[in-house]
Design a protein with these regions (language model features):
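Transmembrane helical elements of multi-pass membrane transporters/channels
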Residues: 126, 147-162, 166, 179-249, ...
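Interhelical loop/hinge segments that connect adjacent transmembrane helices in multipass membrane
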Residues: 117, 144-148, 162-204, 247-261, ...
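Hydrophobic alpha-helical transmembrane segments
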Residues: 91-95, 121-168, 339-343, 357-380
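Interfacial segments at transmembrane-helix termini and the short loops linking adjacent helices
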Residues: 12, 77-94, 217, 257, ...
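Membrane-interface junctions at transmembrane-helix termini in multi-pass inner-membrane proteins
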Residues: 43-46, 99-123, 145, 308-336
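Helix-loop junctions and terminal segments of transmembrane helices
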Residues: 3, 32-49, 112, 170-171, ...
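Membrane-water interface segments that mark the loop-to-transmembrane alpha-helix transition
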Residues: 1, 21, 26-77, 89-90, ...
Length: 409
């Protein structure tokens, strides 16, 4: 709701510029993590004896990646918008969050130990505190740039508190060590995921950047209003999957049948949870936009009705991404994501000039569907996953599996 209030306060054009700056920064965010998150969690679960070396080396890599990413962000924004001083300032401030990525080793540790509650506490706590601060900024009539500073401060506070929680509930920082050899091993496994993560961010955020460059900041503001409602649900699959991933990995080591049963249950849950969200939002989109954002954002209604269905593919995609990690098929994940990103960019070039924001939303749906489901059919290694996802659409079979699961408990 704070994001909605900020949008109403700033208006479509200024909110569009802020959204453009955030999307631009996120476009480079994947570079700063170097594709390490899933690899590190996997190694912490499978190789607990090397945890000190894994965590210490990861922290060093994230620090280096953050610095290099920030430099890349600055160079690119000066090239893309050479005459837009405010955009350059906003991106410079928001991009500074990349410098605090090393604290994310705490997130990886908590996830590997199935105690992600600490991460949730910190993230929710910092969000609530800075939500209050942003309310004060609105009430005091502060300019656009103040919200960028607040976002940076929120990232810094979250990083500091996460580090403290890690010190209290994880290995002692003094025990961590950095190894060049271990860094090479991590990067060897993570580079496909790095490229895949970059491609993911491209096909998730490039629409806002292309709208800003091809149509204008006001169009980005209208589009971002719809996307904000559509994407507000994306924390759900991430939280659920992060909690069950270690259990799925353990099932893989003991029984392949149980492993795929757990995976099927996860697909079922992700699909119908997303449909349960998308259906009411589709029919209530105009009322939702009018109530939340006001009349000035009413053009976002048809965009929301389309874009909300991306959640179906996002929910399934988050679940299946863990399967690629467990099966060490990062290359396949990378290949399909690259294809999705290219399709998204190409379709945006075709659709945005004619259909503007509605075209961008439609392009998002098409590219997500190709990456998450359709591409599974065309590769032998992933065909089983394709049929598992398709089977999740059969509500009768889902209900039957739920009954069997309930009776076994």
């Amino acid at each position: 709701l704070i994001g909605v209030w900020i949008a109403r306060y700033l208006g479509p054009e200024q909110f569009g510029l802020l959204s453009f700056s955030i999307a631009f920064t996120w476009l480079f965010g994947a570079v700063s993590t170097l594709g390490l998150p899933e690899i590190v969690v996997r190694d912490l679960v499978r190789k607990p004896d090397t945890k000190f070396e894994t965590l210490g080396t990861t922290a060093a890599l994230l620090l280096l990646g953050g610095v290099l990413t920030y430099c890349l962000i600055l160079i690119t924004i000066f090239w893309v918008r050479p005459d837009d001083l405010l955009a350059k300032i906003l991106v410079a401030i928001l991009g500074s969050t990349m410098l605090f990525k090393a604290s994310e080793i705490a997130v990886y540790w908590f996830e590997s130990q199935v105690i992600s509650k600490y991460t949730v506490w910190v993230q929710n706590g910092s969000f609530l505190i800075f939500a209050g601060i942003k309310v004060l900024l609105i009430l005091n009539g502060t300019p656009l740039i103040a919200f960028a500073w607040a976002t940076l401060a929120e990232a810094i506070v979250a990083a500091v508190v996460l580090s403290i929680m890690f010190g209290l509930n994880g290995p002692s920082p003094q025990q961590l060590c950095v190894s060049l050899r271990h860094a090479q091993i991590l990067l060897k496994d993570s580079w496909p995921l790095l490229l895949s993560s970059i491609a993911v961010v491209v096909y998730m955020k490039v629409d806002q950047i292309m709208l800003g460059q091809m149509v204008g900041d006001e169009a980005v503001g209208i589009y971002s209003a719809a996307v904000r409602i559509s994407e507000v649900w994306y924390f759900i699959p991430t939280t659920i999957v992060a909690s069950v991933f270690p259990a799925i990995l353990k099932a893989r080591n003991s029984s392949e049948e149980q492993y795929y049963k757990k995976l099927q249950h996860l697909f079922d849950l992700m699909l119908w949870l997303s449909i349960g969200i998308a259906l009411p939002v589709t029919f209530l989109s105009e009322s939702v936009i009018k109530i939340l954002f006001g009349e000035t954002y009413l053009d976002a209604s048809p965009i929301l009705s389309i874009h909300i269905w991306a959640s179906v593919f996002v929910f399934l995609g988050v679940a299946s991404s863990k399967w690629f990690i467990a099966e060490n098929k990062q290359i396949l994940s990378f290949q399909r994501t690259i294809i999705g990103a290219l399709i998204n960019v190409l379709l945006n070039i075709l659709f945005i000039p004619k259909f503007q924001a509605v075209g961008a939303a439609t392009t998002t749906i098409i590219s997500y569907a190709i990456v998450t489901i359709i591409s599974d059919l065309f590769q032998k290694e992933t065909r089983l996953i394709f049929f598992m996802k398709i089977e999740s659409f059969n509500l009768l079979k889902v209900i039957s599996r739920i009954k069997i699961l309930k009776n076994s408990l």
